[in-house]
């Protein structure tokens, strides 16, 4: 075991869904259960911390055998501010690898978790899963197309994103206005001049953002259950 820690961000209000998406049931269990279960099963992860409703998350974990959960933090006003709150729980050892993950990415697998941890162990400042962008991407001004981007160099970033704790503490000490604008953790490391390595992501590792995503996620979970595998 490498002794990595996982920080799961589960404090979203679910504005677009009309309810907190991390607690929407998929196959009879909250989406967050499926997220936590992947980190519970990942041999590289020693401890799990979460950002969100502490009582609700602890009840979920204790009722489902998630015994790696070690603490919960209150959400912040933005994703990065929530992550900063959670990092306060993760310990003072600079060399420990920390994986920051969107709680609504409930289809993450232990195999993907292992890949990002290994990339940091091999020397990268950070590692993020990413997949090629299959669609043609247009830059638009309202309804007017300004230009077409070369998709061969484009990648869609996913989570979990892995970094050493010491580096995370440094980059999350940036001013709050910088943190509010950050849409992922790697962008803060990039801003500080760090090397972020891409590892193969998984197209099934979707983020729940629309009702259609719920249908797709439940179908993928059901297929995995039939196979007896998280792959």
From Swiss-Prot:
One of its GO terms (molecular function) is 2-C-methyl-D-erythritol 4-phosphate cytidylyltransferase activity. The record marks 16, 21 as: Transition state stabilizer. CDD domains: CDP-ME_synthetase. Keywords: Isoprene biosynthesis, Nucleotidyltransferase, Transferase. It is an enzyme of class 2 (transferase). It catalyses: 2-C-methyl-D-erythritol 4-phosphate + CTP + H(+) = 4-CDP-2-C-methyl-D-erythritol + diphosphate. The keyword Ribosomal protein does not apply. The record marks 151, 207 as: Positions MEP for the nucleophilic attack. SUPFAM superfamilies: Nucleotide-diphospho-sugar transferases. HAMAP family: IspD. Belongs to the IspD/TarI cytidylyltransferase family. IspD subfamily. This is 2-C-methyl-D-erythritol 4-phosphate cytidylyltransferase. The gene is ispD.
């Amino acid at each position: 075991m490498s002794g990595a820690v996982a920080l799961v961000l589960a404090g979203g209000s679910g504005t677009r869904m009309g309810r907190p998406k991390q607690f929407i049931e998929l196959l009879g269990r909250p989406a967050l259960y499926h997220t936590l279960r992947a980190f519970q099963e990942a041999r590289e992860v020693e401890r799990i911390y979460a950002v969100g409703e502490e009582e609700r998350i602890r009840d979920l974990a204790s009722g489902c055998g998630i015994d790696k959960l070690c603490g919960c933090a209150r959400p912040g006003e933005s994703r990065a501010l929530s992550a900063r709150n959670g990092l306060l729980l993760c310990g003072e050892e600079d060399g420990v690898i920390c994986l920051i993950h969107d709680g609504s990415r409930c289809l993450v697998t232990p195999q993907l978790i292992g890949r990002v941890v290994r990339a940091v162990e091999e020397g990268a400042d950070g590692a993020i899963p990413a997949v090629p962008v299959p669609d043609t991407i247009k830059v638009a001004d309202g309804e007017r197309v300004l230009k077409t981007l070369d998709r061969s160099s484009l990648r869609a970033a996913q989570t979990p994103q892995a970094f050493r704790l010491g580096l995370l503490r440094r980059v999350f000490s940036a001013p709050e206005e910088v943190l509010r604008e950050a849409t992922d953790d790697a962008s803060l490391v990039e801003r500080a001049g760090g090397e972020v390595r891409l590892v193969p992501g998984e197209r099934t590792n979707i983020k729940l953002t629309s009702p259609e995503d719920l249908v797709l996620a439940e179908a993928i979970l059901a297929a995995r259950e039939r196979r007896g595998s998280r792959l």
